[in-house]
Amino acid sequence: MGAPRISHSLALLLCCSVLSSVYALVDADDVITKEEQIILLRNAQAQCEQRLKEVLRVPELAESAKDWMSRSAKTKKEKPAEKLYSQAEESREVSDRSRLQDGFCLPEWDNIVCWPAGVPGKVVAVPCPDYIYDFNHKGRAYRRCDSNGSWELVPGNNRTWANYSECVKFLTNETREREVFDRLGMIYTVGYSISLGSLTVAVLILGYFRRLHCTRNYIHMHLFVSFMLRAVSIFIKDAVLYSGVSTDEIERITEEELRAFTEPPPADKAGFVGCRVAVTVFLYFLTTNYYWILVEGLYLHSLIFMAFFSEKKYLWGFTLFGWGLPAVFVAVWVTVRATLANTECWDLSSGNKKWIIQVPILAAIVVNFILFINIIRVLATKLRETNAGRCDTRQQYRKLLKSTLVLMPLFGVHYIVFMATPYTEVSGILWQVQMHYEMLFNSFQGFFVAIIYCFCNGEVQAEIKKSWSRWTLALDFKRKARSGSSTYSYGPMVSHTSVTNVGPRGGLALSLSPRLAPGAGASANGHHQLPGYVKHGSISENSLPSSGPEPGTKDDGYLNGSGLYEPMVGEQPPPLLEEERETVM
């Protein structure tokens, strides 16, 4: 009774998490790029210029610093100003009660912040804008309005003075954000590289050995290739999007460079073609990876719950589903972006248009999770039936846990964990935990899948052992041939005989040849007439001992010995299920 209760409770808990986080996952913007930052700055500039026109047209409008900033940016939690700017609070109070009058510093846009009107002789403080993603949103930017009613200039430079030191703390080496980003980049780069290498070896192994060519391994190969293409597309996208400046250059960004982001875009948009292609390819392979994970779940679920299952018939359907359906979603997204939001590089979220890609991915995750829960339910029920009357419940729970852990990488269950907690700021312990978790599991998932479903597969290990035995025996034969001797095998025994001493053994050869050699043209060497004789260099598969169970033979249990598909007394297990045993062993 314990195992079913555990599985039902787990299903209820995680299903509630999925349902409560549908909108959160789809609406979350995980990454912001340079192009998106430029768009956000230009949008803020347009809003600010609109407000400036209204104020200049109707000077009687009351404009406080707080109300002014709320028009162009979401005000964050205020942080106490430094002692140097103790007059800033008084300036805001005066500004709140004042109207735009003669002698006041005019409101303006400095390509970073929309500044309100300034009181002569006072310091104006505004929150660091949240539309600049990497700013410290708890800090403030400062300007001083001199007694003449004009903004204070930088000495020796015809430029308005402004202090953004609290906003640009992310640009210094004194903060830990730089270390966090470097560590995250290293994690996913190493993870995708290891996954790419291991998956390449796994695909070569499954494709090289003909005895491993079957429907389930074909599906495994498609899944491996989807992980490989996802990793390659991520590397290409990063190279195209983030190759403009290096990390050291980013740390030396100045206010002038931030202001330069709002310059008009170039008239020629051909430079964005490569970026758009890279983003489109990345989104396609990302979607295909999720759908091939779903195909694995559908295939295993079909073997368990369908009495008649034609593997060859469904293989073509699975292939079209895994590679074709994502192409439809991506094609629709490309069409919408090209017609309705053809701006800059297409890595921008562009509002609700991102639902075209994210909703199908979310649907694949939810459906695969439901299949996973259903299979675990059947596994728990089978364990209860096979262990009826036994008192060892620890072993039962151990088998259930082991089988669950094996299935989790295949079904992508780890995607569910942080679906309900999308991050909105690049800060905080929760954000760091979430990012490390996602980067670790997403990048290493391909490696885990290759280990479990290829390198730890019994059939794969048996074929590798056979191939290794053939190669070593052939190499040994060639070495002996060069040294002038031959090696012979008599069943389990091996004899090394010098070529000069080899000759016909009359009595033995004559007595064995009528029974073992059908023709009179038998070799003069008596070794050819002995039972079990195999000469090195000509080893056949039948001469080697069996290295593992064949697909149709009975094993000790399915799903790592859990006994999910152990037949009842007098019951013959379906051949497809017996063949599928090695998938999760």
Swiss-Prot record:
Keywords: Cell membrane, Disulfide bond, G-protein coupled receptor, Glycoprotein, Membrane, Receptor, Signal, Transducer, Transmembrane, Transmembrane helix
Keyword Glycosyltransferase: no
Motif (Important for interaction with G proteins): 468-471
Lipid bilayer topology: Multi-pass membrane protein
Protein's cellular compartments: Cell membrane
Cystine bridges: 48-114, 105-145, 128-167
Cytoplasmic topology ranges: 210-216, 301-314, 377-403, 458-585
Protein function: G-protein-coupled receptor for parathyroid hormone (PTH) and for parathyroid hormone-related peptide (PTHLH). Ligand binding causes a conformation change that triggers signaling via guanine nucleotide-binding proteins (G proteins) and modulates the activity of downstream effectors, such as adenylate cyclase (cAMP). PTH1R is coupled to G(s) G alpha proteins and mediates activation of adenylate cyclase activity. PTHLH dissociates from PTH1R more rapidly than PTH; as consequence, the cAMP response induced by PTHLH decays faster than the response induced by PTH.
UniProt-recorded name of the protein: Parathyroid hormone/parathyroid hormone-related peptide receptor
SMART domains xrefs: HormR
UniProt keyword Disulfide bond, yes or no: yes
Extracellular-side positions: 27-185, 237-276, 337-355, 423-434
A cellular-component GO term for this protein: plasma membrane
Signal peptide (residue range): 1-26
A Pfam family the protein falls into: HRM
Glycosylated residues, chain numbering: 148, 158, 163, 173
A single BP term in Gene Ontology: adenylate cyclase-modulating G protein-coupled receptor signaling pathway
Modification after translation (UniProt): N-glycosylated.
Region (Disordered): 69-90, 531-585
Gene3D superfamilies (alphabetical): GPCR, family 2, extracellular hormone receptor domain, Rhodopsin 7-helix transmembrane proteins
MF terms (GO), sorted A to Z: G protein-coupled peptide receptor activity; parathyroid hormone receptor activity; peptide hormone binding; protein homodimerization activity
InterPro entries xref list: GPCR_2 (IPR050332), GPCR_2-like_7TM (IPR017981), GPCR_2_extracell_dom_sf (IPR036445), GPCR_2_extracellular_dom (IPR001879), GPCR_2_parathyroid_rcpt (IPR002170), GPCR_2_secretin-like (IPR000832), GPCR_2_secretin-like_CS (IPR017983)
Top-level taxon in the UniProt lineage: Eukaryota
Transmembrane segments: 186-209, 217-236, 277-300, 315-336, 356-376, 404-422, 435-457
Natural source organism: Didelphis virginiana (North American opossum)
